[in-house]
Amino acid sequence: MASVTTVLDALGAPFVWDHQSAGMGALESQGSALPDATLESIARTGLVLKGPLTTPVGKGFRSINVTLRQQFDLYANVRPTQTIVPGGRYENVDLVVIRENVEGLYAAMEHYMRVGDDPEAVAYGAGFNTRAECNRIVRFAFEYAVKNGRKKVTLVHKANILKILSGIFLHEGRRVAAEYEGLSLIHI
């Protein structure tokens, strides 16, 4: 993180840095993986320069990334991808992945079920998708396509297996697509 702030400072970027902690370091020094001061700083400034945060696998505190997404309604994860080096394994790659960040299995409703003497014999998780959130993320993708001169939106789903949970996403995708003449919807 220090390298990034040094470069931005050298470029004359007009930032006043408000350094806050999160993750394992914050847990050890402040007793919370995501201290109130960090959340207050994010809410106040509306900006975060965040590096990777460790999330314990299997046990421990809830993912800070998931908490931040839900706390600040960071519902759209936008990942542009383009071929940079010609002659590589893949040529002419130019796509943008827009992933919904707060519903589905990201709701993180997980539990153990006891069987006999084993309190963790069965692990299960549940997800949910709301019509409103499905509509919002699909609309975001279509608006992104319009603003960036894209010709199509590909909706990736599992409605063949998760007929209700993923089906509502596909249904809303089709409804929103009907409003965008000139853009095609492909679903897989």
Please give the residue ranges for each predicted region:
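Short, small-residue-enriched loops and turns at beta-alpha junctions
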Residues: A26, P56-V57, N160-I164
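N-terminal phosphate-binding or glycine-rich loops at protein starts, especially the Walker A/P-loop
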Residues: M1-S21
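N-terminal beta-loop-helix "entrance" segment that forms/cooperates
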Residues: P14-P35
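N-terminal glycine-rich phosphate/adenylate-binding segment common to multiple enzyme folds
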Residues: E28-Y124
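An alpha-beta-alpha
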Residues: P119, A123-C134, R139-I164
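Short helix-capping segments at alpha-helix termini
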Residues: D9-P14, R175-L183
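Conserved small/polar residues in nucleotide/adenosyl-binding loops
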Residues: I186-I188
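Short glycine/threonine-rich loop-to-helix capping motif typified by GTGT followed
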Residues: K163-G173
